[in-house]
Amino acid sequence: MLSISININLAFAAALLGMLMFRSHMMSSLLCLEGMMLSMFILSTLIILNMQFTMSFTMPILLLVFAACEAAIGLALLVMVSNNYGLDYIQNLNLLQC
């Protein structure tokens, strides 16, 4: 169990590092966010199953619902930005541009 949780934590850290390094393109940022949500889902599921805490079995499902909503909103924003500007740069989302 310890090696699995270390691997999941490393996957979360790698996705966070990717989010910090590749923040210029929106698609790569969305993929890193999905990787973070997936590792959080797996880790929370493993913790709940190992502790046998039956009252919170719905927490990973709730996390998946929020991840799906985040992905849908992110993809809609990606389509809108790429249709308006032709690129998926995050700097196109700045409202202070002239």
UniProtKB/Swiss-Prot annotation:
Catalytic activity: a ubiquinone + NADH + 5 H(+)(in) = a ubiquinol + NAD(+) + 4 H(+)(out)
Subunit text: Core subunit of respiratory chain NADH dehydrogenase (Complex I) which is composed of 45 different subunits.
Keywords (A to Z) from UniProt: Electron transport, Membrane, Mitochondrion, Mitochondrion inner membrane, NAD, Respiratory chain, Translocase, Transmembrane, Transmembrane helix, Transport, Ubiquinone
Record GO terms (molecular function): NADH dehydrogenase (ubiquinone) activity
Family that this chain belongs to: Belongs to the complex I subunit 4L family.
Record protein name field: NADH-ubiquinone oxidoreductase chain 4L
Domain of life: Eukaryota
Entry membrane topology: Multi-pass membrane protein
Alphabetized InterPro entries for the sequence: NADH_UbQ_OxRdtase_chain4L/K, NUOK/Mnh_C1-like
Gene: MT-ND4L
Entry GO terms, CC: mitochondrial inner membrane; respiratory chain complex I
Subcellular location, record wording: Mitochondrion inner membrane
Cited function: Core subunit of the mitochondrial membrane respiratory chain NADH dehydrogenase (Complex I) which catalyzes electron transfer from NADH through the respiratory chain, using ubiquinone as an electron acceptor. Part of the enzyme membrane arm which is embedded in the lipid bilayer and involved in proton translocation.
UniProt organism field: Microcebus ravelobensis (Golden-brown mouse lemur)
Residue spans crossing the bilayer: 2-22, 29-49, 61-81
E.C. no: 7.1.1.2
One annotated GO biological process: ATP synthesis coupled electron transport
